[in-house]
Amino acid sequence: MAVVTVLSGCIKEKQTGADLKVGDRLPDFEVVMSDGETVTDQILQESVSVVMFFHTSCPDCQQVLPQMQSVYDEYAPKGIRIVLISREDTEESIESFWQEKGLKMPYSAQNDRKIYEKFAATRIPRVYVNEKGGIIRYVFTDDPNPSYDEICTALENVIR
């Protein structure tokens, strides 16, 4: 007899944080990116933005991150802010994963859940597409993982 286990997200988690939805405003936060830039919710209100939470050992995140690099390559030159924030991940593991996958986009290594819990309680990857002014217009989780095309379509809809 076979036993099948269905997992919710990469890791079974207890709900402890916020659960931002479409129409909500980005919460107050500040992170320092790997390129030294400080990003805040106030800065993200100045343009269309994408915020993604990830962990490098999460299989779903491992699938989505290379797609996010393609999104970054296409939209960052157009002034769209793409902000990747780790959840309980180390700078070393992120650097190693970035090098292994050939990723170039900046990220913010967070070794705890303080920033993540301002956005969500459970599930990664988690991708927020936000309009100018900091209002969330799309939320993608691992149910199912967002594709490159879905993220681009969301961005195009918000840009219009």
Predicted regions and their residues:
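A short beta-strand-turn-helix
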Residues: 30-49
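N-proximal helix/coil linker or "cap" segments that precede and/or mark the start of modular domains
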Residues: 7-28
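Conserved redox-active cysteine motifs that mediate thiol-disulfide chemistry
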Residues: 53-70
